[in-house]
Swiss-Prot record:
GO molecular function, one term: unfolded protein binding
Location, primary (coarse class): cytoplasm
Gene behind this protein: hslO
Family: Belongs to the HSP33 family.
Entry GO terms, CC: cytoplasm
Localization: Cytoplasm
CDD domains: Hsp33
Name the record gives this protein: 33 kDa chaperonin
Task performed by this protein: Redox regulated molecular chaperone. Protects both thermally unfolding and oxidatively damaged proteins from irreversible aggregation. Plays an important role in the bacterial defense system toward oxidative stress.
Gene3D superfamilies per UniProt: helix hairpin bin (1.10.287.480), Hsp33 domain (3.55.30.10), HSP33 redox switch-like (3.90.1280.10)
Alphabetized UniProt keyword annotations: Chaperone, Cytoplasm, Disulfide bond, Redox-active center, Stress response, Zinc
Length: 302
């Protein structure tokens, strides 16, 4: 652990854990540059949909980086609004992938008059879900809460309040920055939580109220500003109390799709179903929903 001081070094595609000195509050900060740009540009979604997926990626990294096992965290929301479904898959190696299903005309209609339509506007009524997948031989744990609040951050706070009973605050941001070589996507986020049972650091409620007041000063622009590093951001927020930077975890855009995985799926179809899938070139074309890669495969048994 190291004490934080302002610096000028900026590191993207990393999630960092931190601890407020002498207070029962900890947190994490995520900064996404090239990784989120790769995830979002693979799909070429309308801006409101890309913003929603970017927020979900930042949230998945914030929560998933705390897992103590090798596996995956799946963050998803599904509703009856213009965006039917958003899902992000985070694996504990730091890989991120995600996609959305939506109606383009409905997204365009609800976006009129909004600077940026939020999660509730885009998703409508539905549920917010987090799933912990510890591997093929382990049971999955899944928590489900209603979509409440206009932002995905509020959905996450509600999830932690109901499913984990852990006081939690989340702020997420997504935007585009001009790097001199055209606009690129960026995303960022910050999460703070009470450390349960940590009486040695003082009265929990007073500390939580104090840290929340500092947290509220976080600007969304700071979370995605390519010139503001994580140490600088934390120094701005918490330097009066003292803050320690703990471990950092690198992040990357990564999809687990492969010809072998698709082949396993194809083996589950009947010969008649496979025949209907064959294109004029004699191949079966399969597009991965996560990364948009197109596979052209020989029919099983060909």
């Amino acid at each position: 652990m190291t004490d934080i001081a302002p610096d000028t070094g900026v590191l993207d595609d990393v999630v960092s854990a931190f601890q407020i000195e002498n207070l029962p509050v900890r947190g994490r900060v995520v900064r996404l540059g090239a990784a989120i740009d790769e995830v979002l540009t693979r799909h070429d979604y309308p801006e409101p949909v890309a913003n929603l997926l970017g927020e979900a990626c930042a949230l998945a990294a914030l929560v998933g980086s705390s897992l103590k096992f090798e596996g995956r965290l799946i963050v998803q929301a599904q509703g009856d609004g213009p965006v039917r479904y958003v899902v992000v898959d985070y694996d504990t190696s730091g890989g991120l992938r995600g996609y959305c299903r939506f109606d383009p005309e409905e997204v365009a209609a609800v976006s009129e008059g909004f600077v940026r339509p939020g999660a509730k506007t885009l998703l409508g009524g539905g549920v917010f879900i987090m799933t912990l997948d510890q591997g093929p031989d382990m049971d999955r744990y899944q928590g489900v809460t209603p979509i409440e609040g206009e932002t995905l951050a509020l959905c996450a706070e509600q999830y932690f309040a109901q499913s984990e009973q852990t006081p939690t605050r989340v702020r997420l941001a997504v935007g585009q920055a001009d790097t001199g070589q055209g606009a690129t996507w960026r995303a960022g986020g910050i999460l703070i939580q009470v450390i349960a049972g940590d009486q040695a650091r003082g009265e929990t409620q007073d500390a939580w109220t104090h840290v929340q007041a500092l947290f509220e000063t976080t600007g969304e622009d700071e979370l995605i500003d390519p010139t503001v590093s994580t140490p600088t951001l934390l120094w701005r927020l918490f330097n009066e109390d003292g803050v320690r930077l703990l471990d950092e975890k690198p992040l990357k855009a990564f999809c687990r799709c492969s010809e072998d995985r698709i082949g396993v799926v194809m083996d589950s179809f009947s010969a008649e179903e496979v025949a209907e899938m064959v294109e004029p070139d004699g191949k079966i074309h399969v597009t991965c929903e996560y990364c948009s890669r197109i596979y052209k495969l020989d029919p099983p048994g060909a």
